[in-house]
């Protein structure tokens, strides 16, 4: 699943199809809400495994999709995160995803949806009311429904950091600090309040069904 937040004028999809000789369905979302763009793509996916990719990001291995598919041959794998790199055009900062406490409140050590994959039958939609907490809200609901994700230790994808990236543009909306013993982070108070209202029981007792 490839998601583009901009209108393509360079026939990129046609060139990809010609180079790799495979068929794909191109669904064009006509609106201007990035979250709805992703949900539209998700709702049209027909394969067994969904691997989101965005126009900002790239695979770092020719065998990335093969490695991801291998993970789903393991018994019980419903969704998975892979190792990733944050790339600024010059250097790679490589990381392995970690599910930290207070992930739902923005302590995101898992990275963007570029690093995640999941079975089609297990998917959730992204919440259109969120922007800064869009990804962690999705991860939270996925874990509540499907349990703890598998972690693929291989570095398979790169998040390309640049000023036009949606997450970079959203930093101007930070207006509060969430405190944590291992380091504080900035967040948007309205989105944080929305999350607290959406999951009141979890905020009181932050425990997942897969935790003993």
Where are these regions (language model features)?
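Conserved donor NDP-sugar-binding/catalytic core segment of glycosyltransferases
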Residues: 63-93
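Acidic donor-diphosphate engagement hotspot in glycosyltransferases and nucleotidyltransferases
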Residues: 11-12, 38, 61-68, 138, ...
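Acidic donor-binding segment of Leloir-type glycosyltransferases
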Residues: 1-28
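Acidic metal-phosphate-binding loop of nucleotide-sugar-dependent transferases
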Residues: 6-7, 57-59
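Active-site acidic short loop of glycosyltransferases
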Residues: 22, 45-48, 65
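Glycine-rich, basic loop-to-helix element that forms the pyrophosphate-binding segment
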Residues: 28-45
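Conserved nucleotide-sugar donor-binding catalytic segment
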Residues: 82, 99-185
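Short beta-strand-to-loop acidic/aromatic patch adjacent to the donor-nucleotide binding site
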Residues: 47-58
């Amino acid at each position: 699943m490839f998601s583009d937040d901009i209108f393509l004028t360079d026939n990129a999809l046609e060139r990809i199809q010609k180079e790799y000789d495979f068929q794909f369905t191109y669904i064009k979302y006509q609106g201007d809400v990035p979250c709805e763009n992703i949900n539209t793509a998700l709702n049209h996916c027909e394969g067994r495994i969904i691997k989101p990719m965005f126009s900002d990001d790239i695979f770092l291995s020719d065998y990335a999709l093969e490695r991801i598919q291998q993970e789903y041959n393991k018994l019980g794998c419903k969704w998975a995160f892979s190792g990733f790199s944050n790339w600024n055009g010059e250097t790679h900062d490589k990381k392995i995803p970690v599910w930290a406490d207070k992930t739902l409140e923005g302590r995101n050590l898992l990275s963007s949806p570029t690093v995640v994959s999941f079975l089609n039958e297990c998917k959730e939609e992204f919440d259109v009311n969120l922007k800064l907490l869009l990804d962690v809200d999705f991860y939270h609901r996925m874990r509540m429904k499907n349990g703890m994700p598998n972690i693929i230790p291989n570095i398979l994808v790169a998040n390309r950091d640049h000023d036009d990236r949606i997450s970079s543009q959203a930093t101007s909306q930070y207006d509060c600090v969430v405190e944590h013993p291992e380091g504080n982070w900035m967040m948007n108070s309205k989105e944080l309040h929305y999350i607290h209202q959406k999951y009141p029981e979890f905020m009181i007792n932050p425990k997942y069904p897969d935790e003993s």
